[in-house]
Amino acid sequence: MPPAGGGSESVKVVVRCRPLNGKEKADGRSRIVDMDVDAGQVKVRNPKADASEPPKAFTFDQVYDWNCQQRDVFDITARPLIDSCIEGYNGTIFAYGQTGTGKSHTMEGKDEPPELRGLIPNTFRYVFEIIARDSGTKEFLVRSSYLEIYNEEVRDLLGKDHSKKMELKESPDRGVYVKDLSQFVCKNYEEMNKVLLAGKDNRQVGATLMNQDSSRSHSIFTITIECIEKLESAAAQKPGAKKDDSNHVRVGKLNLVDLAGSERQDKTGATGDRLKEGIKINLSLTALGNVISALVDGKSGHIPYRDSKLTRLLQDSLGGNTKTVMVANIGPADWNYDETMSTLRYANRAKNIQNKPKINEDPKDAMLRQFQEEIKKLKEQLAARAAGGGGPITMPSGGGSPTQKIVERTEEVDPDIDAIKAQMRAELEAKMKSDISTEALDKAREEAEAAAKKQLQAIIDDQGKTEAQKKAARDALKKQAEEARAIAGAIEKEKQEKAVLESRIKEMEGKIVVGGVNMLEKVDELKQKSEDIKREAAIRKRQEEEAKRRLEELQAAQVDADAKFASLDEEINVKSRQLKKLFEKYQGKKGELADLQEQFQREREGMLEDYRILTQQIKLKNLIIACFIPPDYQDKIMQHCHWQDYDSSWNIDCIAYAGNAVRTNQELQAQEDKEHDAAAENERLKNCFFSYEQFEAAGAGSKQGGGGGGGGGGAARPGSSAGRAVGSAARRTGGKAGGKDITDIGSLRDSVNWGDDDDKKKGAIPKAKGLVKDTVDPRLRASKLK
């Protein structure tokens, strides 16, 4: 078992290239990517460059060409990471690349046939295979969750309302997590695969020109594996050992991330919602690239994890307590050269990220120990009931449960009656102590009741007794019958409680998976084991070849550095070869520099286009604000606005008391209550105004709303001369101290053109209200209604 604390390790990066698709073949596209699987090298030719220019070469931990199988990718890339997660490490596998390069195929694949299953379903099967092969001394608890990030909103794909926006939280113990995220305990492969398919149906997908089933969101499927020694095994350890030496809960968390692909609008042909989704996807992937660059740079003291929901959730996976594997997916066609090079460059940089993984022992959110303790407690209760079940039982009083001792009644009755009652109790208790069936116990109770009744009747019939004694005997007979019924009820209740305890223990134990049992039970088990052995041997051989290749490269470099030459000609030849290699590298770097400049220019143009779109939306919102809210009230509103960096949202103080919110509640209340007293409601809301005109008409503007513009609280419309004077005065004097920031509403008013000499525009402003209303973002309208 590896130590709980280890040193740093770099992110493992593998590259997978898909084959040319049917459309690319029909268009006559050529393949520009060559892959050396044994050397772990990818070479990309520039289709626009001269034939003499050498291809760009990149070396990674592992590469997979278009002939590789899904199982090969899983065995070589994912299996070692899953083994570490079962030992208690955190792990992350995420697919990165351009849209349409096969990321979802790599991560999810197809359920049938089995050869096309991706990393996620193969991980399910492998996790439960490992648990099945365990010796049986450990207990496992496996949980799963599934979420997506759509348009920078975190959604629970397994929740009842999968479109509900979830909240991100952060704590020192758990790190960044999603509040109230649904989790399901899974006991086998089939259950976990059902969870995957249920969430997959709720995920956002859409068609573009590059991919008919394009993922429009980032998804994260999380498997949490808890492991602990069984209670019996922990109790059987040596007496000299400490109690908790071998009874730690180890929790490994595996994140399987399927990122949405980066895309260019001119290639995808995205419009409308697809275009908005593409902008959000590109922004989050840009934030991911910035985080990778900052981590590799090492000089930056600030890592911009908070720039995106994606980077916040992957914070531990990039530079934190996680073992991470990045699968970079690329396309082989010449028209994807720019995107392929961009993906390979990011992947090449990600190799230098250093993580510091460690085993997670006894975390506070572990559920397995809670399950164990609850099962132990329930078993102790059941054992106590079984051990004391034959003891005397108290008659229930006030509906309470029976206790394990007799409460004697003090009554002035004949000693013979007490003797009969004691005899009946003794017979019932003797029967309960012996392990007999329910039918036999009922029969014994009936016999005891009959005998007691017979003896008591004989006492009543005895003529030698006084009338008072006979009455006491009759009362005792009646009480004895009630007591017998109470005993029977107590016994039945005890049986029901025992059944409930047994059912609860069985349910709790059913959630815990114990090794030592073959859960698959397949006929071809031996054949499968043989294939696994062959596959493991092939993996070891591949790893040995990779290590040997790297060793030879290092030895060759060392020989060149320490070479001693027998003659001057030999030295000239060696130096010439070295110079030729260096010149080729120089030419390659020179060409790469030109490519980087082109890529930077494209990214800059894309960001400028996004900036223009956002600016257009901001100007529209500013126009709406300027049309409907007087300048002074804009200043007042902005004074009560606060930016929440954690949630990336604006909050306004006392927004529930705003006129629109009150009016909405009033309308809803009026709809629910048809007999609503309008007069009383108007009296209650006499100081609540639903528009600035009502407010100023009531004369409240001069008392409460005196803004920086003076006068009656900014009563003038923003398009009028008075409104412009107020606005200009507010811009000259008001607002916040210091430089202008994004919360300065004066800058928003500046973006609206209120030209004095343009009468047509001023005349068109009132007419544009309906048009502006229709172009408001639906989410804004929904939030307003809320």
Swiss-Prot record:
Entry keyword Nucleotide-binding: yes
Positions contributing to ATP binding: G97, Q98, T99, G100, T101, G102, K103, S104
Biased composition (Gly residues): 702-716
Positions with biased composition (Basic and acidic residues): 771-780
Tissue: Flagellar axoneme.
Pfam assignment, any one: Kinesin
GO molecular function terms attached to this record: ATP binding; microtubule binding; microtubule motor activity
Protein family according to the UniProt entry: Belongs to the TRAFAC class myosin-kinesin ATPase superfamily. Kinesin family. Kinesin II subfamily.
UniProt-recorded name of the protein: Kinesin-like protein FLA10
Gene: FLA10
